[in-house]
Amino acid sequence: MVEARALTAPYQVRFRAGRNTASADTVKNGVGGSSGPRPHELLEAALATCMTISARMALVDMGLTDTGVSVVVTLDRQEAVTRFRYELVLDPPVDEAQYQAVAERVRQSPVRRTLGRALEFEPA
């Protein structure tokens, strides 16, 4: 569960997830700020973070604990479809079979599976 509360600055929000807190913000029509990520960037961050953790777990399972992982996620919001594009980077690079095994774990990451399903929104 995440709780979000509007702050006094226009469009600035403080949110809490468990014991962790952070801010989000946006600018619309010249109003607002940049004290934190914009809401859609939080979606990108959730996916990139989960994919990175999944990749790290796969690498540890393979005994490749010295391989660095980064995932870049970009959200493309169109009228008919919302598309998440992602790039998995392993440093130093691994062989193709290992890369494909890590990429499969990334494709099966929990947040990617969640966002890939039909979504419904309803009041609590």
Regions found by a protein language model. Give the residues of each.
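Extended beta-strand/beta-hairpin segments
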Residues: 1-45, 53-124
